[in-house]
Amino acid sequence: MKTDTSTFLAQQIVRLRRRDQIRRLMQRDKTPLAILFMAAVVGTLTGLVGVAFEKTVSWVQNMRIGALVQVADHAFLLWPLAFILSALLAMVGYFLVRKFAPEAGGSGIPEIEGALEELRPVRWWRVLPVKFIGGMGTLGAGMVLGREGPTVQIGGNLGRMVLDVFRMRSAEARHTLLATGAAAGLSAAFNAPLAGILFIIEEMRPQFRYNLISIKAVFTGVIMSSIVFRIFNGEAPIIEVGKLSDAPVNTLWLYLILGIIFGCVGPVFNSLVLRTQDMFQRFHGGEIKKWVLMGGAIGGLCGILGLIEPAAAGGGFNLIPIAAAGNFSVGLLLFIFITRVVTTLLCFSSGAPGGIFAPMLALGTLLGTAFGMAAAVLFPQYHLEAGTFAIAGMGALMAASVRAPLTGIVLVLEMTDNYQLILPMIITCLGATLLAQFLGGKPLYSTILARTLAKQDAEQAAKNQNAPAGENT
């Protein structure tokens, strides 16, 4: 009898413990799980929208080029049509940005950095359509812009949209989903999941709040974004340069010299971007008519340039494999480099919706290939392959300009599938970053954000000053 009683009591104790465990589980904070679920949703949406953006931009470009092919035998029609088509497409992008969502202009990455610090608003309901359609216009016009900036900003805004749809109010969720969307956006633009994660950790390190949930959320979003991208585009590297040879140890000093060159070029490039922005601001003075006409002229110029020298127009993804293969002479590489520096400054600094990553990668490829070809002539005993310097140069300019060497290294290796070049990449990017910092260069996106915040404060001060006296008393 005592045994039965003891058994019964033991069973009751087990049941009570189970009930207590279930009760504790039910009462536990579900916020981390909810954030991870929403991160998966954000990553999936960003991947879908990123692929859609890529496809629609390609469609617009093909339609424009197809129209030009129809009149290719009639020069008196071809040149004016090339200018008009690109000008009209560009004007659509400039008008939408200026009229409906000024924060959608430019890359959009500084806006996300500002939003992570809660210094810039996130108005996803107007940024998403304007950035998508405006980017279709400017990139479809053949302007020297990349799609990574728009995709990062679109991803961040999708993160805020999902947050609002699920009515989450916690600051942690707001910050985490914004960062998740941005990382997923970069991953969707370049098929580079690890670079997307590093971009948030490295480039946005002052704004990103490190904790276990935020890191897991970023990983989750990037995974989903990459899966969606690969479902639609396959698993091949986004830039096909083939398998390049390894860099022998006795040639590594050349990569350090290349890094020193880019360490000088990066700060100069950043300074030119900022000065060109000031020049455009003085020209249009915020007047929408002047701004749109200016954008149309720049777009039309890119359309004409695409006929004269196709390598000098467009984002640069088509140019990179051709240049890296050594199909141009050193003189032509330097000429295209200078031409694309000018067109990049005109397109990006004018405030067109579009990124600068892809143009910078193309510029790095051009200068890196030129250096590699010159080094091969000067040091024939090394049997150098110019393509390896092209790969190193791709990441070096980004490292010196954006001050994100890890992201630059991993991004280029993921895009080209040449992981054996990681050592020369590290040497080149580290040399470029250290010299750029020594010369006093500032990270491009951080500088643009600081200028945006200064302008925002000045506008707010002007509003307060112009407020009726009755409101101030």
UniProtKB/Swiss-Prot annotation:
Please list the reactions this protein catalyses: 2 chloride(in) + H(+)(out) = 2 chloride(out) + H(+)(in)
Q: What ranges does the Periplasmic topological domain annotation cover?
A: 70-76, 233-252, 310-329, 377-386
Q: Per its UniProt entry, which superkingdom is the organism in?
A: Bacteria
Q: Which CDD domains match?
A: EriC
Q: Known Gene3D superfamilies for this protein?
A: Clc chloride channel
Q: InterPro entries, per this entry? A: Cl-channel_ClcA, Cl-channel_core, ClC
Q: Where does this polypeptide localize? A: Cell inner membrane
Enumerate the residues binding chloride: S107, I356, F357, Y445
Motif segment (Selectivity filter part_1): 106-110
Q: Which GO terms describe its molecular function?
A: antiporter activity; voltage-gated chloride channel activity
Show which residues form the site (Mediates proton transfer from the protein to the inner aqueous phase). E203
Cellular component GO terms held in the UniProt record: plasma membrane
Pfam families, from UniProt? Voltage_CLC
**In chain numbering, where does the motif Selectivity filter part_2 fall?**
146-150
* HAMAP family the record matches: CLC_ClcA (MF_01128)
Please explain the role this protein plays, according to its UniProt record: Proton-coupled chloride transporter. Functions as antiport system and exchanges two chloride ions for 1 proton. Probably acts as an electrical shunt for an outwardly-directed proton pump that is linked to amino acid decarboxylation, as part of the extreme acid resistance (XAR) response.
Q: Could you tell me what this protein is called? A: H(+)/Cl(-) exchange transporter ClcA
UniProt source species: Salmonella typhi
